[in-house]
Amino acid sequence: IHWHGIILPTAMDGVPGISFPGIAPGETFTYRFRVQQSGTYWYHSHSGFQEQTGLYGAIVVDPKEKETIQYDRDYVVLLSDWSDEDPDAVYAKLKKLSHYYNFNQRTASDLIQEIRAKGVSQTWQNRQMWNQMRMSDTDISDVTGYTYTFLMNGQTPADGWVGLFRKGERIRLRFINSAAMTFFDVRIPGLKMTVIAADGQEVEPISVDEFRIGVAETFDVIVEPDDSAYTLFAQAIDRSGYALGTLTPDASVRAEIPEFDPVPLLGHGDMGMDMSSMAGMDHASMGHGAMAMGSMPG
């Protein structure tokens, strides 16, 4: 088991063949170490594809001293992706055809629209660049909702996770992305979120409408709902599906599910290309691995 984000001795890090010999079938291993930090973290297997098949979970370490930020209710929001396919089969397909699960490929209609918008020359240069790299600007995620179901605290979108609250409460939501492959764009329509921690470390509070959470990241936010129901909407970065939850004062009341945001496309900047040599071209930026926030000051 790897204790993600926790400072500990190398021998307790849980990486077979590197930090320790591993745990043989039928055997046990006891992890012992002093916890030297507080915050929101998580654990997961480092053996084969065990993480993809469910060996992961949340870790919340309370501080020794009184917390600087006060709240009335505390929820973990564990995001993940699940496939009924054997992970070895998924991996084998990707090795043979990297875009096997990409069902958002460019069409002839897209080509015509791009020519109308940018002209033949720029469209040709753009397509040539991607073809030379044997890639597509729609290659947002290697594995998509074609095989994945996206979960929130183990619940599918059909069921949805439910968090109850009373009017006037300040709620701490500890978002953890324990997915194997998926980035999520998270928002709660009608409700501002104040980010107070990232990867277990306190940050200067900042109010946002949404944020992007990469694989293995954690973000803690504070929300202050009224007596309405709110949807926790975590859409996959490629818009092939979503994880769903509800904050509500009444378990029988649900909020509307919002529409997907537009499907993003990769740009030259995502490939690390020199923008200065491409003046006038459309450089859409995805911001992979970064916290994409709405309504950020400055």
Describe each PLM feature range.
Residues I176, D220-T231:
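A conserved active-site cap/scaffold subdomain adjacent to cofactor or substrate pockets
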Residues Y41-S47, A229-D238:
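Short, aromatic- and glycine-rich surface loops/edge beta-strands on solvent-exposed regions
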Residues I1-R187, L191-V215, I222, G245, ...:
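Histidine-centered copper-binding motifs that mark active-site loops
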